[in-house]
Amino acid sequence: MFGLSKMLRVGEGRAVKRLQKIADQVIALEDQYANLTDEELKAKTEEFKDRLAQGETLDDIFLDAFATAREASWRVLGQKHYKVQIMGGAALHFGNVAEMRTGEGKTLTCVLPAYLNALEGKGVHVVTVNDYLAKRDAEWMGRVHRWLGLSVGVILSELRPAERKVAYDCDITYGTNNELGFDYLRDNMARSLNDLVQRGHHYAIVDEVDSILIDEARTPLIISGPVDGSSQWYNVFAQIVPQLTRDIHYEVDHRKKTVGIKEEGVEKVEDLLGIENLYAPEHSQLVSYLNNAIKAEELFERDKDYIVRNGEVMIVDGFTGRVLAGRRYNEGMHQAIEAKEKVEIKNENQTLATVTLQNYFRLYEKLSGMTGTAETEAAELHQIYKLDVIQIPTNRENQRDDLTDLVYKTQEAKFAAVVDDIAERIANGQPVLVGTVSVERSEYLSQLLTRRGIKHNVLNAKHHEQEAQIVAQAGLPGAVTVATNMAGRGTDIVLGGNPDILLDIKLRERGLDPFEDEEAYQVAWEEELPKMKQRCEERAEKVREAGGLYVLGTERHESRRIDNQLRGRAGRQGDPGATRFYLSMRDDLMVRFVGPTMENMMNRLNVPDDVPIESKTVTNSIKGAQAQVENQNFEMRKNVLKYDEVMNEQRKVIYSERREILESSDISHYIKNMVDETISAYVAAATANGYVEDWDLDKLWNALEALYGPTFTWQSLVDGSEYGAPGELSAEDLRTALLEDARAEYAKLEEAVTALGGEAQMRNIERMVLMPVIDQKWREHLYEMDYLKEGIGLRAMAQRDPLVEYQKEGGDMFNAMKEAIKEETVRQLFLMRKQFVKQDEEANA
């Protein structure tokens, strides 16, 4: 990975120079576009569309379109793109990741490429990490696009399908990665063209691209439905596990996140259940319940890995600190945690449709992204998504002071020192942002601050709705904000307060909405913004004198990038600022990787609990541990992708055929091919031995009877009545006779249905039969593929490559599924033929 990163950086230098040249050319057009009237500037949109319609390309109108959007942003928002923002916008248009430091205005940067690419009329998707940011950006940046005559939509979790379709039909659509991915899956489960909401995957700009394409890449998007299963065993084992003792009855590997039951544990569980052998075939499922119950107890921590809200267990993303709404652990893990927390146990689910974010975003013809920290992941973004990372220079020189880590023996001593440091900083009027690794830690620190009488705001998965308001005020003099890792990411902490967000809050309190009352909102905005900016600037000056924003990390994250993101909140736009991490020997990362050596040394030297050490050994150990974990996670994501690649190719085939069937007004040729291929497959299987006397024609006819019901017997063929002397019947003769018979019977079905409702009715029936069969067989296939993947690792014990075996067996299973779709569709259609015959007989009786 290191070598690739180095090579990428070499090419990056040339790219930056090219972007600087482009930005200079756009800036050179500033006076020309500033002299246009509002009407003339707005008319540019139609002019650009006409030029594209006449054969020009986006690159031909690139400079003019950027200059137009830049001038419109100034007139509508009072914000003009800096040179570095134009560079970032150009990098996005060319399909790169623009790495722009916190505070450099990524949201405004996005306006330029979104406007340019929307002119093609194929749709632009701007992807954010949560509903709030999607709605905020659609409202704020959407004001520029709407002013220029483009339509803007936003996909929110509560929208109905019809509303989603309207939003996707807009020129520019804002939404979260989850909502876009789930809509893609739902579209590929639709039974009617009217149920489709997305119109394709043309161009996506992914905000916080590292969070979406890397941190969340290991977790697939899954639409599932309940399956039958008993929840009693989850409760039984939730009561058994607390009676077991770690290291005596079972062992835990926190690094690998695995558990193992020991012989003593097996005996104890057998006694508690009153059974003889836990591993007997009739008890085989109990081992899975036991393992999940132990994992729920040992590896899943409340308020860190999940929270319980309104009687529901909700997963917390370990990287972002945000709740993953609608996501559930699979393979019974979620139910085991529900049993542990004594809340309602919901049914286990069967996968109906699934896709990884990696493969969803690779659907786009052009993909780009923005982030403040992507350099450490440049190689992964290039290998998996073919995205190059370009570091955009800062608008002003960075003045942030990154102080050395302080290491304490205990967590209690560490947090006491943290509170002391906060108290000292705010006494001087300096705002403080405190980063924690979990909801639990943020609330623990909140309690300590409350005891000291220190006013503060808490920003974590439990307080998601107040996120913007809290972050907008985090830069006020003496403000204290406690946040989980990336809570609040996407919203700048501006020294003195964020004037845009504070004004938006004020206008909404007055009852003005940028969507509903766009004109009145714009008038009030232009009137109030200068006053709000002045008030914030006066406060900002006081904060600068106090040293700027102080960012305090209470623990190192296993990813350097997450640490860098936290640090990056300080020192935006050339402001002063400082950062420091407080660590303890009992922090998760220290326990896992630094080990007891350092703690033993501190004990030997009699270092008091409240005295920190600054050690290069510890710092280097942490860096090494982070690099090790990052490499492990990268390998895991690559492994997920390799296995999902098998499913992805199969998914593309099924979804493509499904869409073709959905869009076709006449699928009779599909059905007739299915009839021919199914009959041919039956005959081929029955006549594989080659000699008539070896054929099991009774078995073949029984199968054909269940399939469609031949109008003649095999004896009538073999006895020579139709094919000369007995024994001269060939497999091809048999196939030809059966094909003619089946086709004739299907023609009778078509005649009967057409007589009742016309030919269109027959075509509708064919589609109504085929679509549910495809969906049912695909669901069964997904289940079987999951089952195959669970056990495929054991093939390594037989010196076979699990991935190769998975590809081979998965391919065989996919081919079998396609045959099963044909067979079941043909069977159901001929069943209708039999029903028509029966109705005729009853009518004539």
Swiss-Prot record:
It holds the Pfam family SecA_DEAD. It catalyses: ATP + H2O + cellular proteinSide 1 = ADP + phosphate + cellular proteinSide 2. Its EC number is 7.4.2.8. Keywords: ATP-binding, Cell membrane, Cytoplasm, Membrane, Nucleotide-binding, Protein transport, Translocase, Translocation, Transport. GO terms for biological process: intracellular protein transmembrane transport; protein import; protein targeting; protein transport by the Sec complex. One of its GO terms (cellular component) is cell envelope Sec protein transport complex. ATP binds at Q85, G103, E104, G105, K106, T107, D492. Its main location: membrane. One of its GO terms (molecular function) is protein-exporting ATPase activity. InterPro entries: Helicase_ATP-bd, Helicase_C-like, P-loop_NTPase, SecA, SecA_CS, SecA_DEAD, SecA_motor_DEAD, SecA_preprotein_X-link_dom. The keyword Protein transport applies. SUPFAM superfamilies: Helical scaffold and wing domains of SecA, P-loop containing nucleoside triphosphate hydrolases, Pre-protein crosslinking domain of SecA. It is a peripheral membrane protein. It is found in: Cell membrane; Cytoplasm. Gene3D superfamilies: Helical scaffold and wing domains of SecA (1.10.3060.10), P-loop containing nucleotide triphosphate hydrolases (3.40.50.300), SecA, preprotein cross-linking domain (3.90.1440.10). Part of the Sec protein translocase complex. Interacts with the SecYEG preprotein conducting channel. Has a central role in coupling the hydrolysis of ATP to the transfer of proteins into and across the cell membrane, serving as an ATP-driven molecular motor driving the stepwise translocation of polypeptide chains across the membrane. Monomer and homodimer. Part of the essential Sec protein translocation apparatus which comprises SecA, SecYEG and auxiliary proteins SecDF. Other proteins may also be involved. NCBIfam families: PRK12904.1, secA. Belongs to the SecA family. This is Protein translocase subunit SecA 1. It comes from Corynebacterium efficiens (strain DSM 44549 / YS-314 / AJ 12310 / JCM 11189 / NBRC 100395). The gene is secA1.
